[in-house]
Structure formats: structure tokens, C-alpha cells
Amino acid sequence: MDIKIEQQQQQQQVELGPCSPSEVPNDPGKMFIGGLSWQTSPESLRDYFGRYGDISEAMVMKDPTTRRSRGFGFVTFSDPNSVDKVLTQGTHELDGKKVDPKVAFPRRAHPKMVTRTKKIFVGGLSAPTTLEDVKSYFEQFGPIEDAMLMFDKQTNRHRGFGFVTFQSEDVVDKVCEIHFHEINNKMVECKKAQPKEVMLPANLAKTRAAGRSAYDNIMWGLGTLPEGFPAAAYAAYAAGRGYSGYPSFGLPYPTVDLTNGQLTPNNNTPLLTQALSVMNNYQAAAAAAHSYGPSASPHAAAANTATRQGFPSTNSPGPTIDMYSSAAADNVGYVQATSPQPSGFPIAVSRAPLNYSPIYSLNFAMANI
């Protein structure tokens, strides 16, 4: 089933490529051959289907980079009746693989933008603006044949845009040269109206781009953790054990703030609020599981300090340095932070200067009692 869908997509997308209407002749003798083996060549394709009639052209579509077959091709018969012979045969097998021949339909050319028209699009209208306001404004440029505002069926209010049809195309050119017009103290945009066939692909592209933008905003809004840094470590800092000079959780993400150890959204998007609630619960659980966060009492802090392990053993012949010793001369002017990982990891030393604020000094003193 998936192979048939893929073949249909290949036929629709690559059949004749982007061509102008003059380059898209409807050749009744041309067939699309899908499901080809990677070993099938134009010669073998011609040899197999040549039994049904004289072939004027046979080709296998290849990747422009790798030059490998893309698994489909085309056969053009001199006599269109040969196509019926191929289709009535039923199953076809070429180079040990079942192939799927179909009638090749030319791809419809993309409609071009309209450059001469009597109708204009008017967008950005204010809510109080009426149809009479629009007519009275544009009548100064020339006679109007028709005007309309697009209304919402549920609210029965116009949707902020409409169309105006003039009697002359020259008037449209004059109006669109100005581009922006002021109606009821609001600037509105005027453009030449385009057929639906032209606007549909453009609107589809905008919708896809908006979807990607919304997805990106959601992903960044959730506070995706940087690669290579454990989530449990950030849980510790979110619980209140941040250090001066160390990156704070949430700073790179403009849609969330870190307040009292909790991630709070800058907007009330339901999906973002729900996701942050899940993340806060996860961070709290991770912090509790790894004994992160501020100690409940000075005695508990002292107990944690007593069981704290230093650097892992080393094979270096040099002396072992106690980074926690107050007598160590190398620790002056630097903040010493234990790694939030279990004791198998070394100590992370930040080279940022000490922050001598009273709050920081109190927290640092409490943590080292």
C-alpha cells in the first residue's frame, strides 16, 4: 500500500516537472512506470515494453547527485493504442520486480499572478468601518461596479477585509500604486485581487511556515535543556542552589522565567502552562531523589558536608589537593561548587569573582557549616 502511495506521489511531483503551458503537451502515448528495480536501465525498459509497440522514448529517472535510479521512469509509444495493450496485460515483471505502468498525465501549470484586473483587495479595515465607508472613499479614484466586505457567519461581523471592483483597470493601477490608504483613521492595504488558484499555494506555504514558527515557540517555551547537560543538575539549580557566574535555568528562553525555583510562563498559553507544570514536578522529584536543593536545617547541612567526597583517586605522583580546605591558597577569590552529579564526577570550579552580597554570603556560610 505504501509503495503505491509513493508511486502516485512520484508521478504527481516529478512526472513532467515545472513547465509552462506551452511545454505541457498531452501525449496520449506516454506512460509512467513505477516500482522499477535499481538495476533497470533505459535499454531494458525499452526492450520489455517494446513488445507492445514501437517506442519513441524510454527513460529512467535518476537522482542528480548520486546518479542512482529513483525507481521509476517513462515510456512513450509512437502509437497511443499501445498504451491500452500494456494496461490490459495485467501484471508486469521487469528485472525480477513487479512494475506498475500507468497513463502519464501532464502536470498542470501553476497559474500566474494577475497583473491587469478591475478588482482590488482591501485589508486591515477597522471594526466600525461599513461598506458605505469603503465605497465613499474609493469613489474618488473612479466609478465602482461592486464592493463587498467578508463577514464571519458566527459573529455576523466583517473580518477586516473586502473587495472593490472598478470599471477600469487603470483605476486599479492608480489605487495600488499608493498601496496604503487611510479609511476611518486607520491605514488599510490595497492590492490587486488574485484568483483562488493563485492564492491557494501561497496561503498553504504561509500556513506551513506559521505552523513551524508555533512549533519552535512551543519547544523553546518549554525550556529545552542544552545538549550534554544532565537534567538533574538543572533541577538542583532550579531548587535554589545557584552560584554566581553559573548560567541560570531559563535565561536563554524568553517565554519562561525562573521565580523562587519554579518555572513560570510569560504568557497564559494553556499548553505552555501545562508543560511547565510537568517540568516543575519533574525537577522537584529529581532534586529530592539526588538530595539537591537547600538543606532543611544547619545540622542537615553539616551532615551533608561531613559525608561530602572530594576528587576521585588519581595516579599522579603529585600531592593530592584538598579543594575544600580553607587553608588552600588557590581557592581565594573563586567559588567552589560541587558537581550536581553523584560522587563519581570531579569538582566544577567557577572562575567568576565572589559575589559579596549579604544574601549570598549567608547562603554560602550556611552551606559550609
Curated annotation (Swiss-Prot):
Function: RNA binding protein that regulates the expression of target mRNAs at the translation level. May play a role in the proliferation and maintenance of stem cells in the central nervous system.
Top-rank lineage group of the source organism: Eukaryota
Keyword Ribonucleoprotein carried by entry: no
Domain RRM: residue ranges: 29-108, 118-195
Family of the protein in this entry: Belongs to the Musashi family.
PROSITE patterns: RRM
Residues covered by region (Disordered): 1-23, 298-319
Pfam name, any one: RRM_1
Name this polypeptide is given: RNA-binding protein Musashi homolog Rbp6
One Gene Ontology molecular-function label: mRNA binding
Keyword terms: Cytoplasm, Repeat, RNA-binding
Disulfide bonds: none
Record bears the keyword NADP: no
Encoding gene (name): Rbp6
